[in-house]
Amino acid sequence: ESYQLWLDSKTQEAYDIAEIAKAKGLDFSTEIEIPRASDLASRTEKLLEEYLKGLEIEEGLREILLNTDRESASIQIAVDVAKRMYSRDGDLREAIDCGLRVGLAVLTEAVLVAPLDGIGAVRILNNSDGSEFLSIDFCGPIRAAGGTAQAMCVLIGDMIRRELGIGRYTPSTSEVERVKEEFGLYRVGLQYKPPPEEAVSYTHLTLPTTGDG
């Protein structure tokens, strides 16, 4: 405990020195770019403050984390943030985007670049019948999150779109046939290679959102 207190004290001294140096105006910014954070809830809010636009989530997330596991907490806080942002600003796409990033940040301990640069865009598109569905565009840095977090991100998107009343993705016949063809062409190094029909029935046809990129 005394060692932790010493670390906190010395870190604060370093920040005090940095503030004095920044105040001279010789750098590009007069503020310290790396904010201090004490736990996951604090890190998440500070990491995504540009997307949250003043929405406070630290205390709420901390309480959720005390009562549930991190995976469940990521879904709960993502849905909560999306609903609050949509209620406050009225921008559905932006609310979903922010909720997704918050959920992904919780999954990755808010120490990776994935919540910032791994999600390229969130779009609300239309099925052939005119109904809406959610599309998530992923970028290269999402790989830093790992496979489980990437899959969870799609699940979080599905939970958010349900809460906000967005319909599910309905693939066309041509899209299904394309997946069946490409699955056979690109499957490499799998321990189990299901036939195209099985692969489609368990993934593409039951996927309520689309992931691009």
For each feature predicted by the language model, list its residue ranges:
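Extended, Lys/Arg-rich, non-catalytic nucleic-acid recognition/anchoring regions
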Residues: 1-205, 211-213
